[in-house]
Amino acid sequence: MIDTLRPVPFASEMAISKTVAWLNEQLELGNERLLLMDCRPQELYESSHIESAINVAIPGIMLRRLQKGSLPVRALFTRGEDRDRFTRRCGTDTVVLYDESSSDWNENTGGESVLGLLLKKLKDEGCRAFYLEGGFSKFQAEFALHCETNLDGSCSSSSPPLPVLGLGGLRISSDSSSDIESDLDRDPNSATDSDGSPLSNSQPSFPVEILPFLYLGCAKDSTNLDVLEEFGIKYILNVTPNLPNLFENAGEFKYKQIPISDHWSQNLSQFFPEAISFIDEARGKNCGVLVHCLAGISRSVTVTVAYLMQKLNLSMNDAYDIVKMKKSNISPNFNFMGQLLDFERTLGLSSPCDNRVPTQQLYFTTPSNQNVYQVDSLQST
């Protein structure tokens, strides 16, 4: 990880720091020519950070490109407003970077760290860049009044940390919807079965394989580079209006975004054709494709079910049961289910309300069911 990176030449004039007392004075004076960059994991930043600071994260794929000089610092910002703010002000403002506790900075070894790499890159781009002695911990201990703290514990997650490189085990995403998405995505743990009883809240840590090339997941899955690489995922279908496509600038993935909120008023079915075409394109190129929304239980599930219906000539019930067998906590909203029923009629498939006796078993209840094997046959068609 960080220790394996090739050391970046770190000239003595780069080892420039600012004290926490100096920063406090600038904040007290209301210095508008000060740009603070918080280099800690996003969940730590969201929990508490120095006022006016913006969060910067470095996934491994971007870290390598940054080190080679092929990626500008502005590409590291996942939020458009932060990227614009940095671009406007980095050439004129005093830029101060901080991590959790850089108290033993050494100019001879500093270039081996991510903080040193960022300082060098900012210098190369013409910025007046410094690091904060003692980091956030020291500043918070001495000048807590200039720290913004989120007392809402809803951002905490029991999911395992994402293995993304950065300062202090830096991660680039949180499953909190407070800043990213204010629409009506539901907590995966609140999903219910058809009888209204709650489903088990033990959802998979990684995206679920629906077909040998098709994976269903949540927003957090789309930020886990190790998992994307493990499953050969190169295509990412983002079924949200405003969750960022984090690695779009890196050039390693192909994205498609469907701007739909999880709300009864939304017409997701109008995007079925292009979503299905995108998934087929990935399959045709022998690439994995991840379909995700925020929680991974409603919008992305609806698109996945629609794909199975069209490509395997399955009724909505059949396709839904396949997905539910793989991922038990799915819970599309009723409007999306109605759109799937309309899609079923458009495809001329057997309705679940049909009184005709089906020639095959209707529901996929066990892995030994012959219709499940038909799903696997799609890989070779």
From Swiss-Prot:
Highest classification ranks of the organism: Eukaryota, Metazoa, Chordata, Craniata, Vertebrata
Function statement: Dual specificity protein phosphatase, which mediates dephosphorylation and inactivation of MAP kinases. Has a specificity for the ERK family. Plays an important role in alleviating chronic postoperative pain. Necessary for the normal dephosphorylation of the long-lasting phosphorylated forms of spinal MAPK1/3 and MAP kinase p38 induced by peripheral surgery, which drives the resolution of acute postoperative allodynia. Also important for dephosphorylation of MAPK1/3 in local wound tissue, which further contributes to resolution of acute pain.
Similarity comment: Belongs to the protein-tyrosine phosphatase family. Non-receptor class dual specificity subfamily.
Catalytic site: 293 (phosphocysteine intermediate)
EC number, as in UniProt: 3.1.3.16, 3.1.3.48
Gene Ontology terms: biological process: negative regulation of ERK1 and ERK2 cascade; positive regulation of apoptotic process; regulation of heart growth; response to nitrosative stress; signal transduction
Bias-annotated ranges (Polar residues): 189-203
Reactions the enzyme catalyzes: O-phospho-L-tyrosyl-[protein] + H2O = L-tyrosyl-[protein] + phosphate; O-phospho-L-seryl-[protein] + H2O = L-seryl-[protein] + phosphate; O-phospho-L-threonyl-[protein] + H2O = L-threonyl-[protein] + phosphate
UniProt-recorded name of the protein: Dual specificity protein phosphatase 6
Rhodanese domain mapped to chain residues: 30-148
Top-level taxon in the UniProt lineage: Eukaryota
Organism: Bos taurus (Bovine)
Gene Ontology molecular function terms on file: MAP kinase tyrosine phosphatase activity; MAP kinase tyrosine/serine/threonine phosphatase activity; protein serine/threonine phosphatase activity; protein tyrosine/threonine phosphatase activity
One Pfam family it belongs to: DSPc
Compartmental location: Cytoplasm
EC class of the enzyme, as a word: hydrolase
Post-translational modification: Ubiquitinated by the SCF(FBXO31) complex, leading to its proteasomal degradation.
Assigned keywords, A-Z: Cytoplasm, Hydrolase, Protein phosphatase, Ubl conjugation
Residue span, Tyrosine-protein phosphatase domain: 206-349
GO cellular component: cytoplasm; cytosol; nucleoplasm
